[in-house]
């Protein structure tokens, strides 16, 4: 805002405000004639990604968004949802699993990973309970924390995330070992992904695999978002937790506000 004021730019043509009514932001928007979208007060931040908060900036085909949502609610994934949530609940309660590790093998899924981390932490981390979410960017983390995952404390559940049907990339030229000849970077990452799964199976480490189809990227990604929110809400209800609040963090907000005078 300071920059725009210094350059005498019209902020009404460059800013959009998304907020609840009758607060500092909405009053600012009204005063400066900014485009304003009212946000539902009952839709907490981490669950708002498919509202105007998450979708306004993207020119997405709404039909594909609906297809992604329907694939979870109407096409059989709902049965998997209940079954998987029940499995996770059993692991949490009976196997002393208290950590969820996301092994992300596709760089473009990292933003999802950090959102999912927030979703789990703020929804389940209450009343002395937790399912601590950790993000691992793979195969980079094969060379750091993977040793702990494989041979450390057995208190973790893992989810492998990867995109499939990616655009073909260029094969590596014959600079190195013959084994790499005519192999692309995707081929090498696929091999590392599959090798890790094989070792997890061998060591009886609990995990699941989530694959995002790049032939239908919007539908697949929306399905993943919806599935994640519903699974988390089901887990919270089974653990007698409110999935939609974050009371401990609210205390910091109140304390910060009081310190500002």
What are these regions (language model features)?
Residues 201-202, 219-234:
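Short glycine/proline-rich, acidic loop/turn segments that cap or connect secondary-structure elements
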Residues 16-18, 35-37, 101-103, 158-162, ...:
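Hydrophobic/aromatic beta-strand patches that form the interior of the parallel beta-sheet core
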Residues 2, 51-57, 66, 114-121, ...:
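Predominant activation on well-ordered alpha-helical scaffold segments within soluble catalytic domains
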Residues 37-42, 180-181, 237-240:
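Short beta-alpha connecting loops at secondary-structure transitions
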Residues 62, 66, 74-199, 203:
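Acidic catalytic cores of enzymes that act on phosphate-bearing nucleotides/polynucleotides
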Residues 1-77, 254, 258:
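Glycine-rich phosphate-binding loops that contact phosphosugars or nucleotide phosphates
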Residues 137-138, 211-221, 248:
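Small/polar glycine-rich anion-binding or flexible loop at a beta-alpha turn
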């Amino acid at each position: 805002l300071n920059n725009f004021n210094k350059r005498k730019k019209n902020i009404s043509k460059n800013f959009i405000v998304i907020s609840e009514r009758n607060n500092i932001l909405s009053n600012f928007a009204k005063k400066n004639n900014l485009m304003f979208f009212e946000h539902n007060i009952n839709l907490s931040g981490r669950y708002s990604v498919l509202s105007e908060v998450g979708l306004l900036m993207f020119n997405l085909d709404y039909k594909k968004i609906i297809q992604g949502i329907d694939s979870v609610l109407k096409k059989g994934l709902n049965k998997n949802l209940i079954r998987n949530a029940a499995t996770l609940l059993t692991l949490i309660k009976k196997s002393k699993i208290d950590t969820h590790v996301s092994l992300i093998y596709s760089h473009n899924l990292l933003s999802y990973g950090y959102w999912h981390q927030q979703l789990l932490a703020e929804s389940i981390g209450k009343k002395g309970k937790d399912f601590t979410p950790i993000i691992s960017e793979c195969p980079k983390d094969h060379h750091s924390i993977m040793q702990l995952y494989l041979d450390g404390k057995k208190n973790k559940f893992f989810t492998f995330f990867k995109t499939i049907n990616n655009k073909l990339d260029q094969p590596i030229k014959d600079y190195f070992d013959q084994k790499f000849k005519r192999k692309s970077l995707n081929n090498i990452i696929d091999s590392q992904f599959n090798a890790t799964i094989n070792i997890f199976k061998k060591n009886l480490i609990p995990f699941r695999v989530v694959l995002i189809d790049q032939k239908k990227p919007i539908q697949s990604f929306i399905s993943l978002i919806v599935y994640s929110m519903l699974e988390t809400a089901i887990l919270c209800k089974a653990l007698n937790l409110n999935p939609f609040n974050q009371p401990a963090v609210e205390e910091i907000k109140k304390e910060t506000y009081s310190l500002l005078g």
